[in-house]
From Swiss-Prot:
Protein name: Ubiquitin carboxyl-terminal hydrolase 27
GO cellular component, one term: cytosol
Natural source organism: Homo sapiens (Human)
Keyword Protein biosynthesis recorded: no
Domain USP: 78-421
CDD domains attached to this UniProt entry: Peptidase_C19D (cd02660)
Length: 438
């Protein structure tokens, strides 16, 4: 036997029926399960919320000692079995399950399924996955159910072919976003501008596009939701330029060595005004004539979790290749210069560092890095995740090993995940540090 993991629909149906019969027998001898209990898709297992009894409260009162998180704390570190070229999925799952605010949401049992078929709900499966990974079980988990649901809801990812981790991330966020609201809520679930689900609260930012007429200098502004920022790299077919030639500098804590491109360089290029040229004239809304224009992208609204995607895979009519250029990225990132509200980011397309370094609202901390080793045709995905304070681990499917900060920062980098250092609660407009995560 090849010992490969397979998904069998008939066997799962039998398991569901047997589990259902067992639950009926259990229900006949115990109290009825509340309507607020959470259903685990696939097996129909129900977990009641814990309501403390008087004896339990007395026991807790006599044992007030709190559990301390030490350097050897490993709950949440659990490998994932590769089901056949599924490393692209495993590395994203590790990044998502170590996203502090998303972890807190699922482990506090906040999800209430609104899907007509809960067994097809990807949010329910993610909730189950969080419980599995934080159960303390050290043996690798087999995410067969997650893979099956991905195949159902994102058919372009079905099969055992090699897939792209970035493509999986966007597809997963899209399905999670839709399933948070159920399938019958119409346009609201398809428009992130009118959604307040957990996915949009965490991952959605606002990308502002300003098109300026070269004749009358009228500006047309649009703001689009985004879940990530895709950045061009030097060596690609698109034009790129050194941002600080022949001069050492320090931006966002990055050590800028001549010849080394940084994440800040890529963001500078992303937010630099672009001349659209005579072949792309548009009708100006102010002067009502077709004129040449410039376009500039900035961040109108920053997400709680910022994901940066380096365009390492290039597809053209002539060739398909991987760009292996090393990009230096920092542990802490200040996005203030790239905000639409920062006038400095618009001055001749050149980045000006903010004078007020005490503003922490736009500062981020790195917590996950996804890497791709190998070629475009034959490669493998791994991830680095920040587990507790400055402790980093490398997740390579079922194998998890300790890593140093140097290992993380020296890695090639394909996807970078940053978490806001300061969260603002809209209800009370109170800002507080996310001390639990950082």
């Amino acid at each position: 036997m090849c010992k490969d993991y397979v998904y069998d629909k008939d066997i799962e149906q039998i398991a569901k029926e047997e589990q259902g019969e067992a639950l009926k027998l259990q229900a006949s001898t115990s109290t009825e399960v509340s309507h607020q209990q959470c259903s685990v898709p696939g097996l129909g297992e129900k977990f009641p919320t814990w309501e403390t009894t008087k004896p339990e409260l007395e026991l807790l009162g006599h044992n007030p000692r709190r559990r301390r998180i030490t350097s050897s704390f490993t709950i949440g570190l659990r490998g994932l079995i590769n089901l056949g070229n599924t490393c692209f999925m495993n590395c994203i799952v590790q990044a998502l399950t170590h996203t502090p605010i998303l972890r807190d949401f699922f482990l506090s049992d906040r999800h209430r399924c609104e899907m007509p078929s809960p067994e097809l709900c990807l949010v329910c499966e993610m909730s189950s996955l969080f419980r599995e990974l934080y159960s303390g079980n050290p043996s690798p988990h087999v995410p067969y159910k997650l893979l099956h649901l991905v195949w159902i809801h994102a058919r372009h990812l079905a099969g055992y072919r090699q897939q792209d981790a970035h493509e999986f991330l966007i597809a997963a966020l899209d399905v999670l976003h839709r399933h948070c609201k159920g399938d019958d809520v119409g346009k609201a679930a398809n428009n992130p501008n009118h959604c307040n689900c957990i996915i949009d609260q965490i991952f959605t930012g606002g990308l502002q596009s300003d098109v300026t007429c070269q004749a009358c200098h009228g500006v047309s502004t649009t703001i689009d939701p985004c879940w990530d920022i895709s950045l061009d790299l030097p060596g690609s077919c698109t034009s790129f330029w050194p941002m600080s030639p022949g001069r050492e500098s320090s931006v966002n804590g990055e050590s800028h060595i001549p010849g080394i491109t940084t994440l800040t360089d890529c963001l500078r290029r992303f937010t630099r005004p672009e001349h659209l040229g005579s072949s792309a004239k548009i009708k100006c809304g102010s002067c009502q004539s077709y004129q040449e224009s410039t376009k500039q992208l900035t961040m109108n609204k920053l997400p709680v979790v910022a994901c940066f995607h380096f365009k390492r895979f290039e597809h053209s009519a002539k060739q398909r290749r991987k760009i292996t250029t090393y990009i230096s990225f920092p542990l802490e990132l200040d996005m203030t210069p790239f905000m639409a509200s920062s006038k400095e980011s618009r001055m001749n397309g050149q980045l000006q560092l903010p004078t007020n370094s005490g503003n922490n609202e736009n500062k981020y901390s790195l917590f996950a890095v996804v890497n791709h080793q190998g070629t475009l045709e034959s490669g493998h995905y791994t991830s680095f995740i920040r587990h507790h304070k400055d402790q980093w681990f490398k997740c390579d499917d079922a194998v998890i090993t300790k890593a140093s900060i140097k290992d993380v920062l020296d890695s090639e980098g394909y996807l970078l995940f940053y978490h806001k250092q300061v969260l603002e609660h809209e209800s009370e407009k109170v800002k507080e540090m996310n001390t639990q995560a950082y």
